[in-house]
């Protein structure tokens, strides 16, 4: 329902007081008439964005949204939505961003986050406010309210079950941006409810850059935006970079303005990195590392063509225990709303990411939960995928373990061909290719040829638990 309470003068004055002492507010105001956001061919300056934030502070007071209330912000990166995000931060709300792509799940996610108010944005940037008769009972949310601190609730993709809800202190998450950094014209690619999307938005705004949005995240739409808006920095995923290569979009557009491509959310296949570097030889490629629970950590790639990276130590510590990366930092999440605490007694967070170390550099292998146990031999899907992606006429591949009564598990691969080919012929070629490059137990025993995509709205490879269908004549080693 739409709420319409009278303006609360005390709340407005209190909001202005907090706003005046917040470093981010002063920073944004200092950029004045610089372009802050380009959306649907419309440019908003930092001055307009700040004016929009102030208008939202009045709207929040009128609708009875008090500091500490949980507020869902539903939509994409429109000017009014971004202004509301800034206002909610100043108002010390617990913010629950929900991207349009997840709309079918909004009600369930709002229930998990104990949302009390929601603002839903339409495609034309119009909006409406709803209120819910819902008490906030979770200790983490109540703790933020008691500390008068703004919060952020982010959900995992939920590809292997119900989404986990991470609760973060928004001020702590943004503290790293107080140190001035270079400004870029950036395309915001990752979704509003993704830690990478939040990081891109606030990096750009905090350093006087320009955030450019695109209504579609297709190869042509993204490359057209880079060409038209002279984008300098593209944050994306390895999966989308491979899609760009397959679509041949890089060749069809002028991408000469592009200086940096950052990639994360999943391990980068070295074969994909090599090809995309060849296609964009003047671009610097940088691997990022982050999780909803951690934020995005400072990293340094060994070089533009390497999947090895060095984790910075500004504001956090890391260690490797039994091949798994652990992180400790003041900005790490406070905990989950709907899962046990992943912290040990000393405050270390178990990322569940397997890594290899080489001096001061590490390589992200993948999730520990995705390891395949073939008769006691450990196989990680990313190793096999990197080999299979080099086979002619393979567009995409997903590898995972499949139960087997003899070996416990076998390697199973789901392959999408680039062009028409007899499935049996493709399977034979794949196995022949693997025989020269992989140990016998790593060669896929089960191969399914499919036509659908292997990724979801976040352009990250989806590894659901659905078994790959074995053919009747499966031979687990041939």
Language-model segments: residues:
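Gly/Ser/Thr-rich phosphate-binding loop
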Residues: 233, 247-305
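Conserved AMP-binding/adenylate-forming core of the ANL superfamily
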Residues: 25, 33-64, 72, 107, ...
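Conserved AMP-binding A3 loop
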Residues: 45-47, 143, 148-178
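Flexible lysine-rich "adenylation lid" loop at the C-terminal edge of ANL adenylation domains
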Residues: 438, 444, 450-478
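Conserved AMP-binding/adenylation subdomain of ANL enzymes
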Residues: 174-185, 193-233
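Conserved ATP/PPi-binding loop(s) of AMP-dependent carboxylate-activating enzymes
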Residues: 319-346, 377-379
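AMP-binding/adenylate-forming catalytic core of the ANL superfamily
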Residues: 73, 234, 329, 352-442, ...
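Conserved AMP-binding/adenylate-forming
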Residues: 58-101, 191, 378, 417
């Amino acid at each position: 329902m739409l709420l319409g309470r009278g303006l609360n003068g005390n709340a407005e004055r209190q909001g202005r007081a907090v706003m005046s002492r917040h470093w981010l507010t002063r920073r944004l105001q200092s950029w004045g008439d610089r372009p802050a956001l380009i959306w649907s061919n419309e440019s908003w300056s930092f001055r307009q964005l700040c004016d929009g934030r102030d208008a939202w502070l009045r709207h929040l007071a009128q609708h009875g949204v008090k500091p500490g209330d949980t507020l869902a912000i539903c939509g994409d990166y429109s000017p009014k939505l971004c202004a509301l995000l800034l206002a909610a931060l100043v108002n010390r709300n617990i913010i629950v961003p929900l991207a349009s792509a997840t709309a079918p799940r909004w009600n369930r996610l709002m229930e998990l986050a104990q949302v009390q108010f929601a603002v839903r944005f339409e495609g034309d940037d119009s909006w409406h406010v709803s209120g819910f008769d819902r008490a906030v009972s979770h200790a983490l949310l109540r703790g933020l309210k008691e500390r008068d601190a703004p919060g952020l609730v982010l959900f995992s993709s939920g590809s292997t079950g119900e989404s986990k809800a991470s609760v973060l202190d928004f001020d702590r998450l943004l503290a790293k941006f107080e140190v001035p950094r270079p400004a870029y014209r950036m395309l915001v690619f990752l979704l509003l409810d993704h830690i990478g999307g939040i990081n891109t938005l606030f990096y750009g705004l905090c350093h006087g850059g320009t955030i450019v949005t695109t209504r579609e995240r297709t190869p042509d739409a993204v490359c057209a935006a880079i060409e038209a808006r002279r984008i300098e920095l593209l944050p994306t995923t390895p999966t989308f970079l491979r899609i760009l290569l397959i679509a041949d979009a890089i060749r069809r557009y002028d991408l000469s303005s592009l200086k940096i491509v950052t990639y994360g959310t999943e391990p980068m296949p070295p074969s994909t990195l090599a090809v995309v570097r060849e296609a964009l030889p003047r671009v610097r490629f940088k691997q990022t590392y982050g999780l909803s629970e951690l934020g995005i950590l400072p990293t340094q790639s060994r070089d533009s063509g390497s999947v090895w990276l060095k984790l910075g130590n500004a504001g956090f510590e890391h260690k490797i225990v039994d091949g798994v990366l652990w992180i400790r930092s003041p900005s790490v999440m406070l905990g989950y709303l709907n899962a046990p605490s992943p912290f040990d007694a000393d405050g270390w967070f178990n990322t569940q990411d397997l890594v290899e170390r080489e001096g001061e550099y590490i390589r992200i292998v993948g999730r520990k939960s995705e390891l395949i146990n073939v008769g006691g031999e450990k196989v990680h899907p990313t190793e096999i995928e990197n080999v299979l992606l080099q086979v002619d006429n393979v567009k995409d591949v997903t590898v995972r373990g499949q139960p087997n009564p003899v070996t416990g598990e076998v390697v199973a691969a789901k392959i999408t061909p680039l062009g028409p080919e007899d499935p049996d012929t493709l399977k034979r070629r794949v196995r022949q290719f693997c025989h020269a490059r992989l140990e016998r137990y790593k060669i896929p025993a089960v191969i399914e040829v499919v036509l659908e995509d292997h990724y979801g709205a976040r352009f990250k490879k989806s590894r659901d638990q659905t078994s790959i269908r074995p053919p009747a004549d499966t031979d687990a080693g041939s």
